[in-house]
């Protein structure tokens, strides 16, 4: 998608440099190219549409309060604005489909306040830095994405779940307490929202407003251990995966990979490429119980790694990281985000839909989710297979579109007020 009309970019640059300084605006061609892509190329369907848009300028505010200043100028001049954290989204969330201004929040990284049970930080704060800061007070983030290099704003606006979702659900399930957002109505000020009023901004790709600052929930910090186990067959591995739901206190993350995926993961003595791998982040006091469960159910514990590094190693092999590593080994694979009982109850039927299917599973709060990876031939093949999977009871979230699909009604309810000119990340909502 390209911009049809000529945008008043020069005028916008002058205004922003006057208010934010010369260094706030970047026109360097290499920087513009980098700011116009994310990880959408993991989808062969989206990859065929790339490049899908190019930034005309990148603006990097230094604080949350500078973000609405940028949006006021963009509103007055009619220039599209696409927010960007570290660009780690998988669905084209950060691609400026209509060109215009990419708003890079990476310098807005101040941890404003740590309280008992909450932390307030600017949108560009890296989650690793945020978690380290709150751990000094004996607390931790209850959920975070599999990549801790993500920003707080990027995770809230572009992400959904991750490590901790097994216990706490997604980032829309009470994780967010308050938001300060910049809307594109010409007002030039931050808008403060709390509780359920934050939901139209969570996983909305910045289409309803750009998150400038957030207060999120904390829990007490616990001692976690990363447990790596190996299994001879799919049934025993999935039985163990599901049985970990009974462990109290609950594990934080439980992931399963079939052997073909394990063989594509970075080499590690804790991973046996000839067997299925089930990995878990468990409370340290439950380690002995988990070891007994593995022995009783016919598996083998290959390693237990204590401390933050051990747990983060398990997290770094969860969710879409399995897709990344498999595609790195064999670029001919595509993936679907899947969920439902057939993933463990009828795996042969699931595998029969596409050639060379392999499964990565995640134990979630209410069901088993995962990634189905298979040999790609065409968009039609993918869509026909999706219909077959849905007919057998598998629910699907497609990573092959950059339009928003979740909680659309809540998003649309605030659009007329928050973005009357349709300038916030245009192209990410169905017409």
Where are the model-predicted features located?
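General beta-strand structural signal in soluble alpha/beta enzymes
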Residues: 25-29, 60-61, 81-85, 103-105, ...
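Short amphipathic alpha-helices in soluble, non-transmembrane regions
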Residues: 16, 74, 240-246, 286-299, ...
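FAD-binding subdomain of flavoenzyme oxidoreductases
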Residues: 112, 127-128, 132-247
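N-terminal flexible segment immediately upstream of the FAD-binding catalytic core
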Residues: 1-72, 88-117, 261-267, 308-329, ...
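Helix N-cap motif at beta-to-alpha junctions
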Residues: 233-236, 281-288, 339-343, 374-379
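A conserved active-site cap/scaffold subdomain adjacent to cofactor or substrate pockets
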Residues: 223, 240-303
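Conserved glycine-rich FAD pyrophosphate-binding loop
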Residues: 4, 84-86, 93-100, 106, ...
């Amino acid at each position: 998608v390209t911009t049809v009309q000529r945008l008043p970019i020069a005028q916008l640059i002058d205004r922003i440099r006057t208010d934010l300084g010369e260094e706030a605006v970047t026109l360097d061609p290499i920087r513009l190219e980098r700011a116009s892509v994310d990880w959408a190329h993991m989808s062969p369907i989206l990859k065929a549409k790339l490049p899908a848009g190019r930034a005309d300028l990148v603006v990097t505010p230094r604080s949350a309060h500078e973000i609405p200043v940028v949006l006021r100028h963009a509103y007055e001049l009619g220039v599209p604005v696409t927010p960007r954290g570290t660009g780690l989204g998988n669905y084209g969330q950060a691609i400026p489909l209509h060109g215009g201004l990419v708003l890079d929040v990476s310098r807005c990284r101040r941890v404003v306040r740590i309280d008992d049970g909450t932390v307030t930080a600017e949108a560009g704060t890296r989650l690793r830095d945020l978690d380290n800061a709150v751990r000094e007070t004996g607390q931790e983030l209850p959920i975070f994405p599999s990549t801790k290099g993500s920003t707080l704003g990027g995770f809230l606006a572009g992400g959904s779940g991750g490590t901790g979702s097994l216990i706490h659900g997604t980032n829309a399930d009470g994780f967010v307490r308050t938001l300060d957002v910049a809307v594109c109505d010409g007002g030039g000020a931050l808008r403060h929202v709390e509780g359920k009023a934050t939901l139209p901004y969570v996983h909305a790709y910045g289409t309803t407003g750009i998150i400038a600052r957030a207060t999120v929930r904390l829990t007490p910090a616990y001692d976690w251990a990363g447990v790596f186990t190996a299994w001879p067959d799919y049934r025993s591995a999935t039985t163990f995966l599901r049985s970990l739901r009974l462990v109290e206190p609950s594990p934080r993350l439980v992931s399963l990979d079939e052997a073909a995926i394990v063989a594509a993961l970075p080499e590690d003595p804790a991973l046996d490429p000839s067997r299925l791998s089930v990995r878990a982040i468990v409370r340290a006091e439950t380690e002995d119980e988990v070891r007994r469960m593995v022995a009783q159910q016919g598996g083998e514990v290959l390693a237990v790694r204590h401390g933050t590094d051990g747990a983060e190693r398990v997290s770094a092999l969860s969710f879409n990281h399995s897709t990344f590593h498999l595609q790195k080994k064999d670029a001919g694979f595509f993936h679907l985000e899947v969920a439902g009982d057939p993933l463990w109850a009828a795996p042969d039927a699931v595998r029969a839909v596409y050639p060379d299917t392999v499964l990565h599973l995640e134990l979630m709060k209410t069901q088993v989710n995962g990634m189905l990876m298979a040999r790609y031939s065409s968009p039609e093949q993918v869509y026909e297979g999706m219909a077959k999977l849905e007919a057998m009871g598998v629910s699907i979230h497609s990573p092959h579109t950059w339009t928003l699909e979740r909680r659309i009604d809540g998003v649309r309810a605030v659009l007329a007020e928050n973005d009357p000119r349709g300038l916030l990340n245009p192209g990410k909502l169905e017409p």
